[in-house]
Amino acid sequence: MGRLSKLRIVDPVLTNLAIGYTNAEFIGQSLMPVVEVEKEGGKIPKFGKESFRLYKTERALRARSNRMNPEDLGSIDIVLDEHDLEYPIDYREDQESAFPLEQAAVQTATEAIQLRREKMVADLAQNPNSYAGGNKKQLSATEKFTAAGSDPVGVIEDGKEAIRTKIGRRPNTMVIGASAYKTLKAHPQLIEKIKYSMKGIVTVDLLKEIFEVENIAVGEAIYADDKDRFTDIWGANIVLAYVPLQRGGQQRTPYEPSYGYTLRKKGNPVVDTRIEDGKLELVRSTDIFRPYLLGADAGYLISGING
């Protein structure tokens, strides 16, 4: 064992903090849920309409078995990335602190890596080049949801139908950018539909009923650039997708057809600590992952909600 390996101590308590930590504002996992893989590289299925094909399964007496065509299933090469951040704690800070600095360090480093993951998912999902022509729509000046007479319900229905005609299933997930959600809450068409509800205002739960999509998440996360300018990670867009729901306590696998997955190397995230120069404790969070959009036919991007 090398000297550095001896100095670094994997802390199971801090690692469990990192594993259990989630920020409610990060919703990328709704579109590309995390699944564990054994290695940092390899091949996994890429899902097209063939993955959602309805096969003839009835078999007559003494007839041949119905055979699937394995060539229907494509694959892509995957390579995962290591993400790590370390947080320094001076021994004097540790002595004077009124709260546990190690836990604060884990939370800060873990949230920063999760923010990076959220941005990676959002960039993939909101990139028009990720979709075929029939699976995306850029709203015109008269179609944008801030325009008088615009029809959000009709636009969403068209997107749902586009997915259904490609994969035979309706989308069960919708991600709405924060600024798009603000527009939807004030849209006359939606207010008219809920005017007799007890709440009287458009909420996510009411949108689930109006749009008939069981899982809706609003992307509230923001990030700051090098000049401390803040920007929404999720823009004025809506993403519809089919993402299989997790069944009970079963772990997800990358082999079930889905819009996308975030592939993570098994055993991550990990938190370790080491001492530098006798006066600094470095608390380091490491995660190995990469999001992949594997079934573009199972997604639909609506851009330009606010024009």
Curated annotation (Swiss-Prot):
Keywords: Capsid protein, Host cytoplasm, Late protein, Virion. Signal peptide: none annotated. One of its GO terms (cellular component) is host cell cytoplasm. Its main location: virion. This is Major capsid protein. Belongs to the lambda phage major capsid protein family. The keyword Transit peptide does not apply. It comes from the Viruses. It comes from Burkholderia phage BcepMu (isolate -/United States/Summer/2002) (Bacteriophage BcepMu). InterPro entries: Lambda_capsid_assembly. Assembles to form an icosahedral capsid. It is found in: Virion; Host cytoplasm.
